[in-house]
A protein has these predicted regions:
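Phosphate- and other anionic-substrate recognition elements at nucleic-acid/protein interfaces
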Residues: 2-8, 14-98
Length: 98
């Protein structure tokens, strides 16, 4: 059986943090809105039956704390921090139906 590579995407926020498991083709496998104050446990529970090969973390609000939490609970997985500035604007421009 071939294991699908999964990536953990994290959109950090002050009170809520978005979590997404995405496969190598970009297909969303699982989504969750987590409580930022309990992010350690939320990440452990969210990834319980999966093994992400990389974490992609937005550099927005609270990203430093979220990054530290991911490194505590998934120390073997590398974290790539990505620029979030104007990301919603870029998304809306590329999706005219919105």
């Amino acid at each position: 059986m071939v294991m699908t590579k999964l990536y953990l995407g994290i959109d950090p926020g002050r009170s809520k943090t978005g979590l997404a498991l995405v496969d190598g083709a970009g297909k969303i496998v699982k989504l969750h809105i987590a409580e930022s104050q309990n992010i350690d446990n939320e990440i452990v529970e969210f990834t319980k039956n999966s093994c992400p090969v990389q974490i992609v973390l937005g550099n927005g609000t609270n990203s430093r704390n979220i990054c530290e939490a991911t490194q505590r609970v998934l120390p073997e997985v590398t974290v790539a921090v990505v620029e979030e500035a104007s990301s919603l604007y870029r998304f809306r421009c590329s999706s005219p139906a919105l």
